[in-house]
Design a protein with these regions (language model features):
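Metal-dependent amide/peptide-bond hydrolase catalytic core
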Residues: 1-205
Length: 205
């Protein structure tokens, strides 16, 4: 919250920019501190990014409020509540260093997905069965890695006690991108590999 007056006011954008930098600093620290074998490029697993910044109601009016929305990734070994605490402490440190923010502390809300990380061993039979099926179809070994983003597999693994693998066609980099698409040959490969894995796993042959 700021004050919507020009030279004598408090521009919410200026205060919001401090929060943006605080989030960037937290991201850098998490990049330095966290590692996981399924994420060789750990930066892809740990987004800590202000994705939306909304302030003001009119072009010539000093904004007195700013709303920031952040995308925050967690590693499989992390607890979401602990990561939320890290964010809260980081924002609090920045607010304490600014007289206005100290008197008017930012309000934090953690909502939307709030997804825990989840994993199963790469040695698990379901992983190896699907990997073998993929190799039979393509003639090459699959790359076994973690992925970033909310997925329902966490419910099956952590609450349903059901080992689960994410597998499908296309490139992860193309997901949710402009002109998102999946090549037909990728779809054929994925479908065939899944069919072979099901046959093997269920002992149908």
């Amino acid at each position: 919250m700021g004050i919507a007056r020009h030279w004598e006011g408090v521009n919410a954008n200026d205060k919001g920019i401090k929060i943006v930098q605080a989030i960037k600093d937290l991201e850098q620290r998490r990049w330095a501190d966290l590692r996981h074998p399924l994420y060789p490029d750990h930066r892809s697993a740990l987004p800590c990014t202000v994705c939306m910044f909304h302030a003001g109601t009119f072009p010539s009016a000093v904004p007195n409020t700013a709303v920031l929305r952040v995308s925050l990734g967690v590693m499989p070994q992390e607890d979401v509540k602990d990561v939320e605490r890290q964010v809260t402490e980081q924002i609090s440190r920045v607010a304490q260093a600014d007289p206005w923010l100290r008197a008017h502390p930012p309000v934090l809300e953690f909502k939307e997905v709030g997804a825990d990380g989840a994993e199963i061993p790469v040695e698990h039979p379901i992983v190896q069965t699907l990997a073998q099926a993929y190799t039979e179809v393509t003639g090459r070994a699959p790359v076994l890695s973690g992925r970033t983003g909310g997925a329902d597999t966490r419910y099956l693994i952590k609450h349903g006690h059901t080992p689960t693998v994410i597998f499908g066609p296309g490139q992860t980099a193309q997901m949710h991108a402009l002109d998102e698409y999946v090549p037909i040959d990728n779809l054929v490969v994925a479908t065939t590999a899944l069919a072979l894995a099901i046959v093997d796993w269920c002992g149908l042959v």
